[in-house]
């Protein structure tokens, strides 16, 4: 039996590969990340990259020991002689904050805007739109607790999606308050759910003690049935004055900028480090779960990792999920494109010359060459299969004259040009 890729992963393939969707094409990933990079760097964000594996303790302390990520979804790495001391990163925020603290980035002007992209890993059941290895774009801002920073982060996430051409998405905006607000809310939830303990799923029975708010985000059918019967008050009813005023300010900024959003008091973030502003970006056509991504404020994360108090906010979206949404909308996703020039020799003795011409042409354009002599018809067919724009033919006459016979496969234009003027002829 032939060896196949691990379940829940994807090979990123060249353009033109058979039976591939956009999220399986390397060029589509590169295009989407480039669009996000342009939006984020115009806003002052700088790129940061962190290792794909981290100490397990970073994830446990940063993401939270009660989360599904830590309890069920971490990939432990056993190859470093420590038998489990490292894990493949399940998300990017904790790693970025760790890098911020470790490398003295607090000395840079605040707020510091950072972005990254790369693979993340979750040991969960794979399905359409959800994978065990997936690509993520992260945007993080460190060093400011201002509501204006929150609003800008949300606006930038919407701007990235709009630049891609995606319509039909909605920002669902909420707040999970400060730690003391959540303590009051969790006490309320324990009182509410405790009489119904026998109807809760095993996971939610555990959550009732650790973090009752996570019950509201349960996918269990029995939990969903119970939630539908109970009249659960929203977290927004428990916000202290500081968190409530901050939430009103975020809404005011978004409204002033014309950023569309819906208030959603049911927003519950899956990671323990979040506080106050929280949101998700949804699109209904991608299956599994409709969230393309989400974000929120995490002012306490730095202290959990052993650093001082550093306020922060950030968001992330999955590249594969966003590409699925673009395909659902019928949006054309650029491929890598073929060469601008394809050079072929008409006889074997001029194959080295054709190669030399193509190598020189690469100074100004994408150029390929045929590795053997070809008849004109075969050269045109081969160039067309590769997506070339121009075909350049070199025979004995062209070699003697120092010229190239060009044909544009898109327009049919034909001309003979000196090799030294090839760059101008293709411009």
Swiss-Prot record:
Its main location: cytoplasm. Keywords: Aminoacyl-tRNA synthetase, ATP-binding, Cytoplasm, Ligase, Nucleotide-binding, Protein biosynthesis. GO terms for cellular component: cytoplasm. GO terms for molecular function: ATP binding; histidine-tRNA ligase activity. It is found in: Cytoplasm. GO terms for biological process: histidyl-tRNA aminoacylation. PROSITE patterns: AA_TRNA_LIGASE_II. Disulfide bonds: none annotated. Homodimer. This is Histidine--tRNA ligase. It comes from Deinococcus radiodurans (strain ATCC 13939 / DSM 20539 / JCM 16871 / CCUG 27074 / LMG 4051 / NBRC 15346 / NCIMB 9279 / VKM B-1422 / R1). The lineage of its organism: Bacteria, Thermotogati, Deinococcota, Deinococci, Deinococcales. The gene is hisS.
């Amino acid at each position: 039996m032939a060896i196949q890729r691990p379940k829940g992963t994807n090979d990123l393939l060249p353009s033109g590969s058979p039976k591939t969707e956009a999220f399986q094409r390397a060029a589509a990933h590169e295009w989407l990340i480039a669009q996000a990079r342009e939006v984020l760097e115009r806003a002052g964000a700088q790129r940061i990259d962190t290792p794909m594996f981290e100490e397990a303790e970073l994830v446990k302390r940063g993401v939270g020991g009660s989360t599904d990520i830590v309890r069920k979804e971490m990939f432990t790495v056993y190859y470093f002689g420590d038998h489990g001391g490292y894990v493949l990163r399940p998300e990017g925020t904790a790693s970025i904050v760790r890098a911020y603290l470790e490398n003295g980035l607090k000395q840079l002007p605040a707020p510091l805007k950072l972005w990254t992209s790369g693979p993340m890993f979750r040991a969960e059941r794979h399905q359409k739109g959800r994978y065990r290895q997936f690509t993520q774009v992260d945007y993080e801002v460190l060093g400011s607790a201002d509501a204006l920073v929150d609003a800008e982060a949300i606006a930038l996430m919407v701007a990235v999606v709009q630049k891609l051409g995606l319509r039909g998405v909605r920002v669902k905006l909420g707040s999970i308050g400060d730690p003391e607000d959540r303590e009051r809310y969790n006490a309320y939830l324990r009182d509410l759910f405790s009489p119904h303990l026998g109807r809760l799923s095993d996971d939610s029975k555990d959550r009732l003690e650790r973090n009752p708010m996570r019950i509201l985000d349960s996918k269990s059918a029995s939990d969903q049935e119970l939630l539908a019967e109970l009249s659960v008050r929203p977290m927004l009813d428990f916000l202290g004055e500081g968190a409530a005023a901050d939430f009103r300010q975020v809404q005011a900024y978004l409204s002033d900028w014309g950023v569309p959003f819906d208030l959603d008091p049911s927003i519950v973030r899956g990671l323990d480090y979040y506080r106050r502003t929280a949101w998700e970006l949804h699109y209904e056509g991608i299956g599994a779960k409709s969230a393309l991504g989400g974000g929120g404020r995490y002012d306490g994360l730095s202290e959990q990792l052993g650093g001082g108090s550093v306020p922060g906010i950030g968001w992330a979206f999955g590249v594969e999920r966003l590409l699925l949404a673009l395909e659902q909308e019928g949006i054309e996703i650029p491929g890598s494109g073929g060469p601008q020039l394809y050079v072929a020799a008409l006889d074997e003795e001029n194959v080295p010359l054709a190669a030399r011409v193509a190598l020189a042409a690469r100074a100004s354009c994408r150029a390929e060459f045929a590795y053997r002599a070809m008849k004109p018809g075969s050269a045109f067919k081969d160039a067309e299969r590769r997506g070339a724009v121009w075909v350049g033919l070199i025979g004995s006459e062209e070699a003697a004259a120092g010229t190239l016979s060009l044909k544009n496969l898109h327009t049919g234009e034909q001309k003979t040009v000196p090799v030294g003027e090839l760059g101008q002829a293709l411009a």
